[in-house]
Design a protein with these regions (language model features):
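A short, structured N-terminal alpha-helical element that caps or precedes a catalytic domain
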Residues: 1-69, 76-79
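Residues that mark the start of a beta-strand
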Residues: 1-4, 105, 118, 149
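Core AdoMet radical
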Residues: 5-10, 46-52, 123-229, 240-250, ...
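Short, charged, surface-exposed secondary-structure boundary motifs
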Residues: 47, 59-60, 79-86, 120, ...
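A structural motif corresponding to the C-terminal lobe/cap of the Radical SAM core domain
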Residues: 204-212, 221-337
Length: 337
């Protein structure tokens, strides 16, 4: 059987596709990140595509047009997320094949599944249910000669029973693992023990080079709980400058530029690094609210780019040129205004 596995979006290796690669061992498996058929591509007996993000709808549509009989799954469709287990009619599987990602040398997996919270924009509670422990660090690591670098995809690490997360922390320390908490820890529910546990093992970016802890501040109403968590982490030894905070924008119907900049400026004042995550139409603007910036024409995608590129450190958003390639270009624009 000739099979095409297609990663439609996402930076990290796609776990669903690695599960399919494991299932199709012995078949002729082709992996691609191209959503359209190449000129010399063969015909396939089966085509799969996996997409994570809702904003990938255009790429999903192009993929389906190129491969009309493809099986497409993933969380991009929040109303009806399709899982590998449903497609293959199997129970939840933790077996996957890394061979489709030959340049990836870390290990990736979950110590727990599910989430205690029920955020309206998130598919995890519907898809995975209540928190439960599923793996040890040792079972996630691929073993020698692979580096002791772990990408943890847990959505609610501290939501599993306390004795379980403490055991995982012990494994990380004893095994001298470097861990990237890719999905973020829930800073709203963090306590002193959890903060100290994180500080004791260190937290790393996805390249395992820089100290970084991922978390989120999605709702303005969570301000007090968010900063309570920030203070607990700082007291434990994790400075705010080491936090990268996912910042949901465009979800709340009351969203305005004033509300967005309130969260943004509260974080940057503490050297926290925000990372906007856009809900819905990326090219729309918002009401100003009480914001006195001249940004009524700016879009959410432009704001996201301005923040991710850290252009806010040297040029106001209203003067930001989204086509500028680097700091020099932006600085020249600022001088010309």
């Amino acid at each position: 059987m000739r099979v095409r596995l297609t990663q439609i979006d996402g930076k990290l290796p796609n776990v669903a596709l690695m599960k399919l690669a494991h299932h199709h061992r012995g078949d002729e498996v082709h992996f691609s990140k191209h959503v359209e058929r190449d000129m010399l591509e063969p015909e396939y007996d089966r085509v799969y595509g996996s997409a994570i993000f809702e904003f990938s709808a255009d790429r999903v549509a192009r993929f389906r047009a190129a491969f009309p009989h493809a099986i497409v799954g993933g969380t991009f469709d929040r109303a009806n997320p399709v899982t590998v287990e449903a497609v293959l009619n199997i129970e939840d599987s933790e077996a996957w094949d890394y061979s489709i990602y030959p340049g990836f040398d870390a290990s990736i997996g979950f110590t727990q599944r599910g989430c205690r919270l029920k955020c309206g924009f998130c598919v995890v509670p519907k898809k995975e249910g209540k928190p439960r422990s599923v793996n040890t660090i040792a079972s996630i690591w691929r073993g020698d000669p692979w580096p002791r670098h772990i990408h943890l995809l847990d959505n609610d690490f501290f939501g599993q029973p306390r004795e379980q997360w403490k055991a995982r922390i012990g494994e990380i320390k004893d095994g001298k693992f470097k861990v990237c908490w890719n999905q973020g820890v829930n800073i709203r529910t963090i306590d002193k023990d959890a903060a100290e546990a994180l500080a004791s093992v260190g937290c790393w970016d996805d390249g395992f080079k820089t100290r970084r802890l991922y978390t989120a501040w999605d709702n303005l109403g969570d301000e007090e709980r968010f900063f309570s968590g920030v203070r607990l982490l700082e007291a434990a030894g994790i400075h705010p400058r080491n936090l990268l905070v996912y910042m949901l924008v465009g979800y709340d119907r009351r969203e305005t530029w004033e509300r967005i900049f309130y969260r943004f400026e509260k974080m940057t004042a503490l050297e926290i690094r925000p990372y906007p995550m856009i809900f819905g139409n990326r090219e729309r603007t918002l009401p100003l609210g009480g914001c006195n910036r001249r940004i009524a024409h700016r879009t959410l995608s432009e704001f996201q780019r301005w923040v991710i590129r850290k252009a806010y450190t040297f040029i106001p958003f209203e003067h930001y040129d989204v086509n500028a390639k680097g700091r020099a270009d932006c600085s020249q624009l600022a001088l010309a205004v």
